[in-house]
């Protein structure tokens, strides 16, 4: 999985080694298996981190505009399901606050950048996403922290393996995704 892409963080962040990554995943994320890389800020304790994940969803046509209202509705539905499955209610529930910023697709980089501000009980949380399309799915960079952590997607570079680049799509052999770009956005997890 690690050979799918390379994550280059901005100054002040460090990509964990393979063994450090596995330990971090086991301790903090519960053993998910689609993570390519984990990065921590210098001196970080794990409460603020970045992860690069791979979503092999098939080719997604990028000419469908992103409707933030539809994304917002889908996120709310996902949060309702998360709260129900986790038995969270009232003051302990995970709640939507706002986009921070709203989803925006850049056709030159083939990436969507956006942020979701949440409250988990009384605690604020922020997930920033940079989702870059591939010929067979997407790479998703997720920065996890709080609004006070000063997180930014600036300076992060995601370099996919050359043969996985979006423009390498072969309509004769590559599978197409069943959903749209919006569906792919809604597959992103909240951490």
Model-found features: residue ranges?
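N-terminal leader-region detector that preferentially activates on the first domain or presequence
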Residues: 1, 52, 132, 142-143, ...
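Surface-exposed amphipathic alpha-helical segments
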Residues: 13, 139-176
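N-terminal mature-domain "stem" immediately C-terminal to a signal peptide or N-terminal signal-anchor/transmembrane
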Residues: 1-11
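Extracytoplasmic/secreted envelope proteins and their assembly/folding machinery
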Residues: 10, 72, 76-79, 151-155
